């Protein structure tokens, strides 16, 4: 199954600030696999909130939701040290989007 990836400005800001080029490349490779339906290691945190788990880069995490069965919306990212705050932020973004359809400013990304 092929997914269309979209990202929020919060996610883009975080991802663009990753300093380690190897971590960024591995992250991009993982997102390319997600786009092709291979999510790898992930955890469902709530009915519509998921966490991609990485075992490099300080325990990198990407929080996402799936819309319409075909669109993966990348909400925020972080690592183990910011996990609690990142989950709260992702939940807030989802709540806002649920109350006001189309409120999430996002852009389509492809690999």
Q: Model-flagged regions — what are they?
A:
Residues 8:
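PIN/NYN-family metal-dependent endoribonuclease catalytic core
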Residues 29-56, 104-111:
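A short, surface-exposed loop/turn module that caps and links secondary-structure elements
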Residues 19-33:
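A short, compositionally biased N-terminal segment around positions ~18-40 that is enriched
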Residues 1-5, 13, 21-24, 39, ...:
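Enriched for short, Lys/Arg-rich terminal
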């Amino acid at each position: 199954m092929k997914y269309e990836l979209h990202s929020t400005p919060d996610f883009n800001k975080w991802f663009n600030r990753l300093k380690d080029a190897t971590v960024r490349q591995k992250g991009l490779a993982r997102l390319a696999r997600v786009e092709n339906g291979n999510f790898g290691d992930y955890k469902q945190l709530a009915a519509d909130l998921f966490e991609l788990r990485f075992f490099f880069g300080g325990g990198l995490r990407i929080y996402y939701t799936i819309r319409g069965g075909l669109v993966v919306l990348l909400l925020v990212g972080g690592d183990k040290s910011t996990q609690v705050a990142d989950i709260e932020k992702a939940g807030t973004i989802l709540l806002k989007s649920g109350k006001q359809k189309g409120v999430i400013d996002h852009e389509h990304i492809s690999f």
